[in-house]
Every structure is written in structure tokens, then in C-alpha cells.
């Protein structure tokens, strides 16, 4: 059966039997000769928020079309721009501001990014409770100068940008309406279990590039969370339980050394997991840790693995470069190898390990028949 399968595959690849006898690793060489590129399917770091009301030029949008600019409403703070064409947006970014100006009640989108603001005083948004979007990234805000209830009255707030500041803890309480919370590039060291309480509508949480050592069970109540980014922190263990709706998990550049058995079972929609640049060893991984049928991409590069961990046959991209792997076990990809059972893996990176091309077993072409790139 094995020889028949090899003959069939060789015919599909336009390779002769003579070629196979001459080089038992013809299949590996064939893949290396194919033109393949690695495209990151998702960029998890959108540092600058998309502005729904584009305001280009000092004279405003109307000026670009040849019509004279309309006068700004009288309630607009003199430090800011309030384009008449977009009456619910207020632009106060890049003005060297050291304080938050008055916000008119009609505003829904306010931009205070890239200033020298160090505090968010209590009641500063009480006049504009209909706010949907607040951008405060790129300032000098510290946790001790954030009003305790400064966001509590904003019952419609959906996006809050507080990244690139000097925060040491997550502001609380936050409105239930919040969908995106950007707290990356701060100095947050821990996430208490109740820090994110009530945020049942939150879909994206960015906490990368902080000093977080533990998060406990703070993520369990985030039932709508799709994206969680905790990369570039000081975590030694993964969060205690993941939200059931989670699709993207980023934990690279931490100090994680183990992942519990069936850890991802409670997140049946999980597609992308990145755990590169940690301290993972095979002793810290159970046999079913990554055997999740929903996973499409798994990045375990630059750890301390010596063996390829078992993965689901549905996995499409597996990155294991920069480990200490010294053997190629086909059972990590296919528990049964035949014509009807095979892996959907398309990209496999094993470069920078202790494994050689000759370590690939003879039945690898049958199991990994869909692979377009294998690097050793």
C-alpha cells in the first residue's frame, strides 16, 4: 500500500520512479523548489485608530472641494478643531495640550492623542455622555491621576485608546458598552480578577508591551472577547481559563513554561495561537494540549522543545523554528497514515533546530501531502 501511494503521489508531482530511487527525499526537494512566501494573516498591533470622520488639511474637508470653509460652532474649544461637516467629531491631537478641554454634549468622537496630558480629571466627560470613541493614546497619563468614575457615565462608549501612556493599572470601572480596549505600551504589572468585570461586550483587548506577571481568572467573564493580546509581558503561566468566543490569542515574548492539558477545549472557535519566544518544554505540554480541531495557525518558535508536539490534522500553519527538536515524528501530524487520512498542514517551519533532512520518514509525503512549504 505504501509503495502504491508513493507512485500515485510521484505521478501527481510530475516525478518519475527513477527520480524517487535516486533520491529518497525527492519530495522534500520538490517543496523547497516551489515558490512560497509567508504572509502574516493578521496584524494584531493597530497602534493608530481609524478615524471614521476623515479631516484633512488645516482648512477642513470643504476647502478641498473649492468651497469656503464654514465657521466652527461656538461651543468648540479654541484648542481644538470641530469640522462643521462632521459635527460629532472633535480633533485636539498633536497640540501639546497638558489638560483635557471641555467636550460639547453633541460629540461622539474625540481625539486627544499625542499630547502631554497627564491626568483625566473626574467629570471631564459628564457633559458628553453619548461618546462612542475616545482616543487618548500617546500621552503621559498616570493611574493615580485618573478619576475613579471618569468613564462610568459613558454608557455608549465602544472604543477607548489609552495605549502609550504611564498607567500602572487598568482603569475601573469601565462601561459595559465597551467593545475595544487599548492599554498596550504602559507599565501595568497585574490584572486583578475584577479589573474587567462587567465587560460582556468587549471583543478586543490589547495589553501587549506591559509588565504583567499574572492575569489570574480576569478573562473568564469576557464572553464576547475575540482577540486577546498579552504579548511582550512577564507572564510565567497562561491565563486561568479563556473566553469561549476567543479566536486569536497572542502570548509571544513572555516566560511561559507550560500549558495545561486540554487548555483550549473551552474555546472552540480559536483559530490563531502565538506562543513564540517563551520557555516551553515538552515536559510542560500534555499530549492533547494543541490537539484542537479549530486551530489553523500555531506558533511555538524560539522555545526549548525537543520533540514536535501532537497537533490537530486541521492545522494549516505550524512554526517550530529556533527550538531543540532532534527528531521528526510523523505521528505528531497523523496518527494513521494512509490514502484517506492526512494532515491539512500547508506550512511547516523546522529551521534552526537540531534536525536534519534525512530525519524525515518515508511516509511523510503521504501524511503531509498538502504542504507547500517545509523548512528544515
UniProtKB/Swiss-Prot annotation:
Keywords: Disulfide bond, Extracellular matrix, Glycoprotein, Leucine-rich repeat, Proteoglycan, Pyrrolidone carboxylic acid, Repeat, Secreted, Signal, Sulfation. The keyword Lipid metabolism does not apply. Binds keratan sulfate chains. The modification Pyrrolidone carboxylic acid is found at residue 19. LRR repeats lie at residues 106-127, 130-151, 156-176, 177-198, 201-222, 224-245, 246-266, 269-289, 294-315, 316-335, 344-365. Binds to type I and type II collagen. This is Fibromodulin. It comes from Bos taurus.
